[in-house]
Amino acid sequence: MTGARNWLNKPLIFFKFNNHHTASPGDKMVKYVAFFEELGKDDVGIAGGKGANLGELTQAGIPVPPGFVVTAATYDKFMTDTGLQPVVMEMLENLDVNDTKELQRVSAEIKDIITSTEVPEDIQTLIIESYNALCQRIGKDDVYVAIRSSATAEDLPEASFAGQQDTFLNIRGAEDVLDYVRRCWASLFEARAIFYREENNFDHSKVYIAVVVQEMVDAEKAGVMFTVHPSTGEDRILIEGSWGLGEAVVSGSVTPDTYWVDKGTGKLLEFTVGEKNIMFTREDGRTVKKEVPPELRNKRVLSDGEIAALAEMGRRIQDHYGSPQDTEWAIMDGDVYMLQSRPITTLGEATEETEVKSREILVKGLGASPGLASGRVKIIREIHELDKIQIGDILVTVMTTPDMVPAMKRASGIITDEGGVTCHAAIVSRELGIPCVVGTGNATEVLKENQVVSIDGNRGLVYEGSVIEGEKKEAEAETVTVESPLLTVTEVKVNVSMPEAARKAAATGADGVGLLRTEHMMLTTGVHPRKFIEEGREDELVNTLAENILKVADEFYPRPVWYRTLDAPTDEFKTLEGGENEPYEHNPMLGWRGIRRELDEPEILRAEFRAIKKLHEQGYTNIGIMIPLVQHPDELRKAKMIAEEAGLKPHRDVEFGIMVETPAAALIIEDFIEEGIDFVRLEP
């Protein structure tokens, strides 16, 4: 193997392992590491979009911080040599990516498998020697680097999505570099990336990931630059910038300064100074998010000279590639660096303006993706709220993240408080072809849940009601206007006995499940729950319960599902395997059942609570617990103690309620309230 330590004498390094390896990306001579100087725009197959374009920029004489690429062949070798490839592909088989919770679960499991698998020694040597060679070139020990994913399909002209895989900043030392390269490999299976590949019919087994390891630029100011208007294709340069590292702009954490530049003359045509409240900087080897000093928040970031230098560099890059480019830049000590460049794949034309007649303007922002759309406002403040976005809704949030892409696909338009026209929300909206308004400042506060609004992605305006007239309005109505169910003050819930009936029950439009019975789930196993416990099969019982409860919780999510703990009459469980010792009772309906029985057999109740905890950890926090046939607050108190032993804190982690089925319980309801309950079901 040619050693990376010889790199100064041989500027182009090719690594070749002697052991057998089939390189799916398919070069005659497999490159496992390539420094930027040896890469060009045609090397997307081995270096991914980022890596190939950094090589192309370097060869074109554009100032780029030095670095190297751990190629897609190395990832392929890692997955093959460790035996992970067939395991991961099997986990992805038959996955429904529109099932958000299942997608998140599978993604987390795959990433955990990859990051916990030791990197083979030959690959470790390759990466560590390459990092040491980079440090030698720069003339420093343990150089700080940025480690960025570079998927082989991420930045191709026909497919572009922001932020599918991970980026790690301020990584230092060979061991940490090795660890974060592996994390980048794992990020190929982020939920958002899996979803994107499925939606675009990319074969998971044929998508690879390269990893860029690049000297870290400790930027004083940074941002993005489009060499044409990203929405309309207008031939002028757009620059966005903010203080510190570029993460603040790219992530949409701030509303950056916006500068429009004449491409021919380099003259600044217009600019808007954004309110830049936060910044990312490097402190003690860590990327730190901090507040921008008050005197800089509303101060212009770029000088005329810096704008001219960036515009000139943008023209050079576009001329070199022969097509409009989306670039990232940074300025350190007065020097301008390009961090990456990729083709703009979302160019469109401004849509025909529709006349707006006497409509109230609710909020104003920046038009980030052209078009007009009307729909009902759905405000997203937490990631677990995404499932409330239905087809045709208007998604309103502070700023979108890559995890929101499946919900964004269902929306007819996007509105954000923060961000500029090159933030995540803007890029994804243009890719999806839906209108987007960003940087409104207060949309999440001004707009109301379920309010009907219209957004103008050309002008950056949001109007009250529907403003789409004529044919456009009719066409929009087919996808946006939904016949709302009758609204009542009292919620109407359904009973569900069999998980298989959940879909039909959910389709009724009920406000939730007021009673999810456990007994049918137990009976279908054919085994008495006590037998599971006695034979040490508690985990099997937990998983069986969780699988059945999940079918209901998923259909109704985020509507509440009240799970009633086991209320097993003795006569029904006699026929189960292990039920031979069930006592004989003259009237089982008034006998040993409900919470009385479960406190006598606490292991079964604990297994039920463990199943619910497992589902809560997967995001199904809509499941509440309901205790049946309570007679006294002491029973409720003991049930809560068992729940806490199982890892569920009543009232904090999970809603905890009771069924009132006897006059005695009804007469002392205030005692139950004092003990603490979140809801009551009255059983006549």
From Swiss-Prot:
Keywords: ATP-binding, Kinase, Magnesium, Metal-binding, Nucleotide-binding, Transferase. Substrate binds at residues 517, 564, 661. The reaction takes place in three steps, mediated by a phosphocarrier histidine residue located on the surface of the central domain. The two first partial reactions are catalyzed at an active site located on the N-terminal domain, and the third partial reaction is catalyzed at an active site located on the C-terminal domain. For catalytic turnover, the central domain swivels from the concave surface of the N-terminal domain to that of the C-terminal domain. Its EC number is 2.7.9.2. This is Probable phosphoenolpyruvate synthase. PROSITE patterns: PEP_ENZYMES_PHOS_SITE (PS00370). Mg(2+) binds at residue 661. InterPro entries: ATP_grasp_subdomain_1, PEP-util_enz_mobile_dom, PEP_synth, PEP_util_AS, PEP_util_C, Phosphohistidine_dom_sf, PPDK_AMP/ATP-bd, Pyrv/PenolPyrv_kinase-like_dom. Pathway: Carbohydrate biosynthesis; gluconeogenesis. The N-terminal domain contains the ATP/Pi binding site, the central domain the pyrophosphate/phosphate carrier histidine, and the C-terminal domain the pyruvate binding site. GO terms for molecular function: ATP binding; metal ion binding; pyruvate, water dikinase activity. The active site is at residue 424.
